[in-house]
């Protein structure tokens, strides 16, 4: 399932989307969401999912445009051995704001969740990431992981990461981690010695974050739209060749 939210680059306005999913026993859904809205848009996006026994939900999100983006994703892993895998990539610049709230509720036995987010903050951008793994009583053998990797390309950005693990069951495993930093001076020196300027280096590193998630999209036409929005039209075809 592909949801592509797009507009002209200079467009402004508000948009709100709510997606509800009920995965019955053994069902598998891959939900792909791409946000390519204009730089004056405020976008609110909410996902709610319920997974029954051995159901599997994969969520892939690319946040590339808009001024203010608010994301929410709550998945209840109700059935035994149900699973969630969420991958999010973002680029936030200017005075843009990105607010993310991801929740994995483990109710069934041997359920699994993996929530990963990675992106780049530029200029005066603000980003808040909240990731919650909630182990309910009875979720024996459940495993939950959350991780964020943020690259800061300005001293004026505001980055906030709030991981939370709630546990009402003993026989579970929960892990969280975050990597937040700037480009290493030695790496900058090396790349500059190879003929790249600072702007090119920052752009390359930003695109690497998006490309890592974009490659997980199986539809070539959708990947091409992402590259076009990023000003890299034709690179998808070249990479495939």
Regions found by a protein language model. Give the residues of each.
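Conserved beta-strand/loop scaffold segments within soluble protein domains that form the structured core
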Residues: 1-196, 217-241
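Extended amphipathic alpha-helical segments enriched in small hydrophobics
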Residues: 189-211
């Amino acid at each position: 399932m592909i949801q592509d939210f797009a507009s002209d680059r200079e467009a402004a306005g508000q948009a709100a989307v709510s997606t509800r999913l009920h995965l019955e026993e053994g069902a598998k859904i891959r939900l792909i969401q791409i946000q390519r809205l204009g730089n004056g848009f405020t976008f609110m996006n909410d996902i709610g999912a319920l997974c029954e026994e051995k159901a599997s939900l994969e969520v892939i999100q690319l946040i590339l445009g808009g001024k203010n983006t608010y994301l929410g994703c709550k998945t209840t892993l109700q059935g035994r051995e149900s699973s969630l895998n969420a991958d999010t990539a973002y680029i936030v610049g200017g005075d843009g704001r990105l607010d993310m709230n991801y929740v994995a509720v483990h109710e069934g036995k041997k359920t699994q969740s993996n929530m990963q987010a990675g992106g780049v903050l530029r200029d005066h951008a603000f980003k808040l990431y909240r990731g919650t793994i909630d182990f309910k009583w009875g979720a024996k053998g459940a495993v939950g992981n959350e991780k964020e990797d943020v690259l800061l390309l300005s001293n004026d950005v505001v980055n906030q990461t709030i991981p939370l693990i709630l546990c009402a069951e003993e026989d579970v495993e929960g892990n969280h981690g975050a990597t937040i930093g700037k480009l290493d001076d030695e790496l900058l020196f090396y790349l500059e010695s190879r003929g790249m300027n600072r702007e090119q280096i920052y752009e390359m590193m930003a695109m690497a974050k998006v490309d890592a998630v974009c490659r997980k999209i199986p539809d070539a036409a959708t990947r091409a739209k992402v590259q076009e929005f990023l000003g890299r039209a034709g690179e998808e075809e070249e990479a495939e060749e």
